[in-house]
Amino acid sequence: MLFTDEGKSEKPFPYLLVNLVLVDLRSSFPNLLGQLNSPEYESISTRLASAFDVVSAFIGFLVRFLEYESAENSISSLMMAPDLLFKLRQSIAETLSLAIEYLRDRWDAAEAGAMGLHPDARLGAANTSRGSHFTLAWDSKIDRASQDPLILAAVRALAIWLREDENDMLRMEAAGLTDMLMDLYRSSTEDGARLDFRSPVLVALEGTTALEDGAASLLDHNGWEVLTQDLLAILRSSSSASSEDEAARGIEIVRVLIPTVERESPGSREAWMAVVTAVAAWDVPDAEQPPVVCEFQVAVLQLVTALMENTHSGMQRRYVHSISAVLGIVEQLMDKIVKIHDEALEDSLRDVESTLSGLR
């Protein structure tokens, strides 16, 4: 395996490889914006995207290995000494911090012109006493930022690290990219989109929304509207089709939204309750479906439960008919899940049923 080392060298190959890749990335960022329209940019972008892919693969390997580490299979014996691993951790965090700066600068130049500028105030006609003209953007003449494989590779590597490494400082820095992340998510749903940023964006949001400021930034940049629109579209489509990839993305959306709901004070916003109404009107399919699709459907019901539980009694009384409809959905799903013998999903559904029944 690429990231294992059977030898006893002082600095094993995995350490040297990843360290070299990180050095290449850090040294490339300062001049990257100035090369956007150069003939060499395509090859530079491909090289750096590959470098980020190596970093992503290393982080993924490290996470999986630590999950299954045992006394006979210690990380120091298979991979590298703990002190070298600590150095790599610091180096990865430093590199990704620089990547955040680059992504911010690239996105501002391409789309906004100022950090976090609201979408309504971006590129468009500027009305002056001399007439209307369009505001400027500085970006590649050939490809938009949302079509650059380097941006996708960078976001993917950053996302995995944000979720797996509890580095609040880096998460705070990344929370400043929330407007960019939501724009990339939206662009991935457009017809003809060349790259799909949705899954990496959701993974990144898992990390940033662990902080209160990150969750607030998500809401400030229309994150709730964007994510719930996609979530409900997946739910509706699951009535007639069973896309496991779509269902997996829906589960990731719920992972982001439930902590946001639970953190909201003094309770769920009234606009959010549209999700409850939409789910209550959903038709449960009769056909047997893959386990991941059932898991997604249960996750949506858990989101509804979180919304209802975190609101005041007056709001709960207003939605009593929706609660009854959702409980009917719970009953139908339970009949299906019992047949696939998934005890964890059964327990989750019972929790949903118990909580919602107590709110009527």
Locations of the language-model features?
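Extended alpha-helical scaffold regions
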Residues: 1-360
